[in-house]
Design a protein with these regions (language model features):
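Short amphipathic alpha-helix used as the core "switch/output" element in two-component signaling
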Residues: 43, 65-77, 94
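Basic, Lys/Arg-enriched C-terminal extension of HTH/homeodomain DNA-binding domains
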Residues: 176-198
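Receiver (REC) domain active-site loop signature in two-component systems and cognate sites
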Residues: 59
Length: 198
């Protein structure tokens, strides 16, 4: 049984390091996909799904920071943890400023890395959920968005109708459309799905 909440990837140009890191993480119960360069990773992985990548900083052709930038430009929810054999404090600070969740110097302590991976996977799943909610909200009309905001604030239908200068029936139709488009059946499910992005 894998302990992965979402896919775990390692990108490192040093094959012995790649293999030993994968072996160590598999011994902790993870299922791991490995790549020896950034291009192979980009061609193989769906950047719009949750995941965690352990990324070497210094690789030929495409450095880890370049790969991370490409992922950020794609709005990827995949969490990044840097691993390097040649790190320093300024490099770590820059990586964290760029959105990496953690930075480890090789050789790395397995327990510390596992804790960071578990945290990164949870963060990635939350990021994917937020992105999914934002995309779903884009399908709403302007008026449906207005009604949604008022619903999330806890306003009653008649009060919404008065505030938006429309009939009660119009509010009920918009509210029903919002529920259908967001694929929820209750107010609690609606708030859970989009309350954090409004």
């Amino acid at each position: 049984m894998s302990r992965n909440l979402c896919p775990l990837y390692i990108v490192d140009d040093e094959v012995p390091v790649l293999e030993s890191m994968a072996f160590m993480l598999e011994s902790y119960g993870y299922s791991v996909d490995v790549y020896s360069n950034g291009q192979d990773f980009l061609q193989s992985v769906n950047l719009h799904q949750a995941g965690c990548v352990l990324l070497d900083c210094r690789m030929p052709e495409m450095r880890g920071q370049e790969l991370h930038l490409l992922m950020r430009n794609q709005c990827s929810p995949i969490s990044v943890i840097y691993l390097t054999g040649h790190g320093d404090i300024p490099m770590a600070v820059d990586a964290l400023k760029e959105g990496a969740l953690d930075f480890f110097q090789k050789p790395v302590d397995g327990n510390a890395l596992v804790a960071a991976i578990d945290n990164a996977m949870e963060c990635s799943l939350k990021n994917q959920e937020k992105q999914s909610a934002k995309l779903t909200l884009q399908s709403l009309t302007r008026r449906e968005k207005e009604v949604l905001i008022l619903v999330v604030k806890g306003m009653k239908n008649q009060d919404m109708a008065n505030q938006l200068c429309v009939s009660l029936r119009t509010i009920e139709v918009h509210r029903s459309n919002v529920m259908k488009k967001l694929e929820v059946e209750s107010l609690a499910a609606l708030i859970h799905k989009v309350g954090h992005v409004i």
